[in-house]
């Protein structure tokens, strides 16, 4: 757990009168704990508390190989995960809730909580902290940008050959990033030739580059993220 970052979030909570904060966004949980998890449809929650008694709720199918320095509550698919969260909030007054948390979990927690408990949108507590980058983060962002420049140069050269389709070029992007020290794509890359190439979220096809075509490339690499 990154205690310095957690303390900043706790300060934000205190300023807004929240005694607990439910965080469900995996990237925010990773930012605060260093634990990277992709839960899919299963409930995954970090519950921060002003008293320092923090708890993470994990499905028993998740893999954990590090000491997170907090309480861990494990549940199975056959168990009522949100009820476990509600139990941890039985004495809560004001609970901040992640803007990305699914209603199917939140509604169950609200149903089981005490009548005096108030739920508020609480993501701003984490968002404010993440907006202000630490020096190490700035260094990583600069390096990620440098690597992306090198990667896109290679992609431009692939496109310039003229014998590769949009899909064929797109499929090589992840390998290019990995060769430069990145873990892969940060999102699905877009390579678009010619007319309508600037359409939002274009999906590549078997189009080949023709003389006079414009080329749209939208790509990014994941570097120590």
Locations of regions flagged by a protein language model:
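A composition/biophysics-driven feature that prefers long, compositionally simple stretches
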Residues: 1-150
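Generic secondary-structure signature for well-ordered alpha-helical cores
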Residues: 114, 143-153, 157-161, 174-182, ...
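Short, glycine- and charge-enriched coil/turn segments that flank and shape catalytic ligand pockets
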Residues: 90-93, 115-117, 158-165, 208-210
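Residue-level detector of alpha-helical recognition elements and their boundaries
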Residues: 44, 110, 155-156, 163, ...
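Short catalytic-site patches enriched in acidic/histidine residues
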Residues: 29-39, 125-126, 132, 164-225
């Amino acid at each position: 757990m990154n205690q310095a970052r957690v303390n900043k979030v706790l300060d934000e909570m205190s300023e807004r009168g929240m005694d607990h904060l439910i965080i469900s966004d995996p990237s925010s949980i990773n930012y605060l704990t260093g634990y990277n998890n992709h839960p899919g449809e299963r409930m995954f929650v970090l519950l921060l508390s002003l008293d320092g008694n923090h708890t993470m709720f994990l499905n028993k199918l998740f893999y954990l190989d590090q000491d997170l320095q907090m309480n861990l509550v494990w549940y199975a698919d056959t168990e009522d995960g949100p009820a476990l969260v509600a139990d941890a909030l039985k004495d809560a007054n004001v609970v901040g809730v992640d803007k990305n948390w699914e209603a199917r979990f939140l509604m169950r927690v609200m149903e089981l909580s005490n009548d005096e408990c108030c739920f508020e949108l609480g993501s701003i507590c984490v968002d404010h902290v993440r907006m202000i980058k630490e020096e190490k983060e700035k260094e990583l962002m600069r390096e990620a940008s440098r690597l992306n420049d090198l990667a896109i140069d290679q992609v431009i050269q692939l496109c310039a050959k003229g014998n590769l389709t949009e899909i064929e070029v797109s499929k090589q992007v992840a390998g290019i990033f990995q060769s430069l020290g990145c873990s892969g794509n940060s999102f699905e890359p877009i390579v678009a030739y010619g007319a309508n190439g600037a359409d939002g979220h274009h999906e590549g096809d078997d189009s080949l580059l023709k003389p006079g075509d414009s080329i749209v490339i939208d790509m990014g690499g994941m570097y120590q993220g």
